[in-house]
Every structure is written in C-alpha cells, then in structure tokens.
C-alpha cells in the first residue's frame, strides 16, 4: 500500500478485488491541511507483450477540503472528491480528473469500478474513439478521455489547445459563485467579489427568499453581470413571476429552474430572459428535447463523459441555435485545464471550482477573482 509522504495522522486501509482480479489498495490519509483518498491501481503484469505497446495505468481518488462550505439548493459541501487517471506510455504521462456526482447515480466507488473494468484495454492502447463505446457518458469516461487527450498532447510536445488548433486569450473571465445564505450574507459576498474584480457573478438560489436575496445582491453589485442557478429547485407554479423579477433586476440568464423531468412545463413558455439547461443536457442526444424549452446549454465534461463528446456537443448545439455555457464541478485545476479548449465558443464560463479549494493541485492554474490567467 502507498502512503502520501509526510502526511501524519490516522490511516485506514481497505482492499478490494476487481472483476479482473487486480488488487486495488485504498488508503485514506488524514492530514492537517488536506484529506486525500488515494486508490492506486497496479496491474498484475506491467511488462509489454512482444509486438504490443503497453501503457501503465494508475487510478486513485482524492478529497480536497474547501476553505468555505459550498451551499446550494441540494445541500452543503465541505470538500471536493475527485478520481484521477494517470496513463504512462514510453515515459510520457497523461492525466485526467473527474468528479463523481451522486445525483447522477455516481459515487467514488462506482466510478473507480467503471474505470477498472477497462484497464486491460487501456493497457493495450485503447483510443478515445473506442472509449466512447465502452463507457457511458459520465465521470468515469471523462477522467479516461481527458487522460488520453493529455497523453496525446504531451507526446506531441504541445498544449491541448495547440493540439486542437485553438487560440486562447491569456486571461479568461470566469463566473464567481455566490452560495446560498441570508440576503445579507449573499449581498456581502457579492460586494466582496465585485470589489476584488469579479465582473460575472453566478448566484445560487433555492425556492426561499428569492426576491429578498436578489434585490440585496443587485444593490450590493449594481454593475455586475449576474446569472442565476436554481439547481432545479423551483416548480412551474410561479415560474413566470420569478423570471420577470430576475429580468427586472437585470439578470442575464437563469440556469435549470425546474427538475429535468418537468421540462415539458417550459414548452412554449414565454420568458423575458434566456434559460439554460444544465441537468437537462448531458450529451448531443438530449438536444432534440430541449428545442422550444431552453436557449442555452451548460457543457460540463463530467456530464458529457469527456472532452471528445463535449466538443461534439458544442458544435451540434450551436448548429441547432443554442448558446453555450461552460461549467465545472468542484474540482482541481486539472479538470479546468481539460475544459479550456471550449472557452472560445461559450457566452459564459463558470470555471471557479478550484477557487473553493483550501489548496489546489501542483502545478495549478493561476486564478484571481473573476479571472483565469494562462
């Protein structure tokens, strides 16, 4: 079993056997600054078969404490759990990261198990194209897909953007999130973010105190561009009045007001501001059902199952007349780096996940309030 060097504290070991009879060691290490769950996959054989190129594969999980609780309509988080895939081929390493999401039926264990099932194929040179057929869209495929992209870019001694022929500005505007609290707390947070340089605020709401919170926030940051995320906590009843309130306060967009199963209520619904699909849009297969209901889709690599499908979704969504938003889960800079090629296509980028961490991965992207610096 592997221990994180220099991390004192309690240690708990769990060993389980995969369906391929490979042993996975799960080591939980509690440290003063961070809590790291590390799962290392070690194949039984790492020697190459004659005439066959071989990769080494590592799969492990991490937990990154947040400096402030992340409070949204569905609850509160105090740490970010991620699963990391490392692929190494001829001395070149590619890394991908995902964030398992319970609301999508995912857990750290289920995502690890999904990835473990395809390790033999990864060892033998699995391609991104073949991966799309082996795993469904979701966190597990995302980690592997991004690791394959990263591996290819590094093999060619290019950045991911160079590999794709995409140019990025040296500074990217990202939304900064205002989490749920009292109207006074949210207004104070909005004012602090604005005063530090954030020009785009993403306000989390549930079904309570909507008017009080939004009026206070707008008064605290009168010049900010504001987008609102209800995290599917609203109902169709009263939606028209809430949309009008947001429009009157100059809100630029409303994200996922209703649960995905209630999307039919948005059919031919007249609304004064754009509505963006988050939980209602995972891949290209969802686009047909969104027509006439949403004007924008939020692309997240953990929903699409990686950059491969995310790029295809962006192209198809724009062709069908949708505007785009780029989002993220609570994550490290590894996950944001993988999503950056999509930035030139989107109207809003919400990439502040790593800014909630008490400590980011090394090396990491450089964030200032409201901006990512490349």
Identify the residue ranges that each predicted region occupies.
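Intrinsically disordered, low-complexity polyampholyte segments enriched for Lys and acidic residues
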Residues: 10-11, 25, 36, 44, ...
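N-terminal capping/lid subdomain adjacent to the active-site entrance of alpha/beta enzymes
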Residues: 41, 49-226, 231-240, 244-248, ...
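Catalytic core of soluble alpha/beta enzymes
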Residues: 203, 208-329, 333-343, 358-367
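Short helix/strand-capping turn motifs
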Residues: 347-350
């Amino acid at each position: 079993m592997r221990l994180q060097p220099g991390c004192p504290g309690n240690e708990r070991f769990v060993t389980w056997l995969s369906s391929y009879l490979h042993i996975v060691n799960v080591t939980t290490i509690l440290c003063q600054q961070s809590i790291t769950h590390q799962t290392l996959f070690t194949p039984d054989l790492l020697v190459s078969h004659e005439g066959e190129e071989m990769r080494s594969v590592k799969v492990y999980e991490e937990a990154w404490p947040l400096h402030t609780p992340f409070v949204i309509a569905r609850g509160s988080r105090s740490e970010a759990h991620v699963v990391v895939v490392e692929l190494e081929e001829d001395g070149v390493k590619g890394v991908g990261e995902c964030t398992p999401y319970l609301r999508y039926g995912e857990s750290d264990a289920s995502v690890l198990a999904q990835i473990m099932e395809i390790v033999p194929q990864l060892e033998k040179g699995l391609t991104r194209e073949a991966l799309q057929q082996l795993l469904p869209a979701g966190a597990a495929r995302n980690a592997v897909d991004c690791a394959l992209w990263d591996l290819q870019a590094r093999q060619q001694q290019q950045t991911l953007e160079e590999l794709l022929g995409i140019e990025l500005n040296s500074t990217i505007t990202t939304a900064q999130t205002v989490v749920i609290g009292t109207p006074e707390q949210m207004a104070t947070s909005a004012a602090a973010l604005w005063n530090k340089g954030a020009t785009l605020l993403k306000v989390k709401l549930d079904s309570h105190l909507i008017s009080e919170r939004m009026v206070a926030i707008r008064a605290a940051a009168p010049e900010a561009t504001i987008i609102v995320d209800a995290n599917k906590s609203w109902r169709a009843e009263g939606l028209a009045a809430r949309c009008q309130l947001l429009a009157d306060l100059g809100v630029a967009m409303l994200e996922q007001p209703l649960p995905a199963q209630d999307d039919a209520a948005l059919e031919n619904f007249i609304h004064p501001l754009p509505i963006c699909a988050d939980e209602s849009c995972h891949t290209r297969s969802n686009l047909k059902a969104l027509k006439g209901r949403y004007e924008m889709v939020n692309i997240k690599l953990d929903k699409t199952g990686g950059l491969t499908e995310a790029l295809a979704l962006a192209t198809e969504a724009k062709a069908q007349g949708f505007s785009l938003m780029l989002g993220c889960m609570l994550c490290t800079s590894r996950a944001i780096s993988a999503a950056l090629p999509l930035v030139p296509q989107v109207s809003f980028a919400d990439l502040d996940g790593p800014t909630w961490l008490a400590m980011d991965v090394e090396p990491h992207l450089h964030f200032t309030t409201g901006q990512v610096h490349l």
